[in-house]
Amino acid sequence: MPKLVLVRHGQSEWNEKNLFTGWVDVKLSAKGQQEAARAGELLKEKKVYPDVLYTSKLSRAIQTANIALEKADRLWIPVNRSWRLNERHYGDLQGKDKAETLKKFGEEKFNTYRRSFDVPPPPIDASSPFSQKGDERYKYVDPNVLPETESLALVIDRLLPYWQDVIAKDLLSGKTVMIAAHGNSLRGLVKHLEGISDADIAKLNIPTGIPLVFELDENLKPSKPSYYLDPEAAAAGAAAVANQGKK
């Protein structure tokens, strides 16, 4: 039976500062490193053994995966990285303080930019220090497909081809697949797997550093409800994510 393990990266330095991060490459905070280590301990304690790893191209997801797999004694498994698993591109909001952005735009527009399904923030200018123009990570990617801003709908559009064409093959061969990625790329994947509506996806918050497990059937649909390896910590973490921007 295919098994999928989703891990949102641990707290990053910009999560700690309450900044919109998106495609800006920042590292894990000290707390984030601890969360990643705990994720690995949970994998080992619960006997969930990934056979192959997928991550985004961003350091915080890569760090999380490396720390977790070392704790789980699985650092040796094959690794694949793709920009298609990157966080949502937050456009002109990248690098901005969430609380200040809330004050500037008001709660309705802030929530629209942050949580609506199909409304992206204003695009980032190529001259911005938080733009990815010229970033070496993407030098082999067609520049016409690289975003300057994204909604969750656009994240799903660029994520699903990679899921269907690449990740699915490992799952269908019976492997346990671990994906270490980001709040919005993982929300998009969970939406696809669970058939969550465009309206209801706004309510889904994925906590940092706690493995979420899907047991899938031969059609890669959940054969039972998904579950966190630490449900109590996951509930508290999801509530903290929901409150971001309010301090």
Curated annotation (Swiss-Prot):
| Record's catalysed reaction(s) | (2R)-2-phosphoglycerate = (2R)-3-phosphoglycerate
- Modified positions (Phosphoserine) in chain numbering: S12, S116, S127, S128, S185, S197
> Could you tell me which SUPFAM superfamilies the record lists for this protein?
Phosphoglycerate mutase-like (SSF53254)
Please state where this protein is localized: Cytoplasm; Mitochondrion outer membrane; Mitochondrion intermembrane space
Where is it chiefly localized? Answer: cytoplasm
Give the record's membrane topology: Peripheral membrane protein
Q: Name its pathway.
A: Carbohydrate degradation; glycolysis; pyruvate from D-glyceraldehyde 3-phosphate: step 3/5
Q: Which residues bind substrate?
A: 8-15, 21-22, 60, 87-90, 98, 114-115, 183-184
| Keywords from the UniProt entry | Cytoplasm, Glycolysis, Isomerase, Isopeptide bond, Membrane, Mitochondrion, Mitochondrion outer membrane, Phosphoprotein, Ubl conjugation
Q: Which InterPro entries match?
A: His_Pase_superF_clade-1 (IPR013078), His_PPase_superfam (IPR029033), PG/BPGM_mutase_AS (IPR001345), Phosphogly_mut1 (IPR005952)
Tell me which SMART domains the record gives.
PGAM
- Enzyme Commission numbers on file: 5.4.2.11
Instruction: Please list the GO terms describing molecular function.
Output: phosphoglycerate mutase activity
| Highest taxon listed in the record's lineage | Eukaryota
According to its record, what are the GO cellular component terms?
cytosol; mitochondrial intermembrane space; mitochondrial outer membrane; mitochondrion
Asked whether the keyword Transferase is assigned, the reply is no
Task: Spell out the activity regulation.
Answer: Inhibited by inositol hexakisphosphate and benzene tri-, tetra- and hexacarboxylates.
> Cross-link of type Glycyl lysine isopeptide (Lys-Gly) (interchain with G-Cter in ubiquitin): positions?
K31, K57, K71, K139, K175, K191
Q: Where is this site: Transition state stabilizer?
A: H182
A GO BP term here is: glycolytic process
Q: How does it assemble?
A: Homotetramer: dimer of dimers.
Q: PANTHER family in the record, alphabetically?
A: PHOSPHOGLYCERATE MUTASE (PTHR11931)
Assigned protein family: Belongs to the phosphoglycerate mutase family. BPG-dependent PGAM subfamily.
- Please describe what this protein does: Interconversion of 3- and 2-phosphoglycerate with 2,3-bisphosphoglycerate as the primer of the reaction. Can also catalyze the reaction of EC 5.4.2.4 (synthase), but with a reduced activity.
Protein name in the entry:
Phosphoglycerate mutase 1
Classification of source organism: Eukaryota, Fungi, Dikarya, Ascomycota, Saccharomycotina
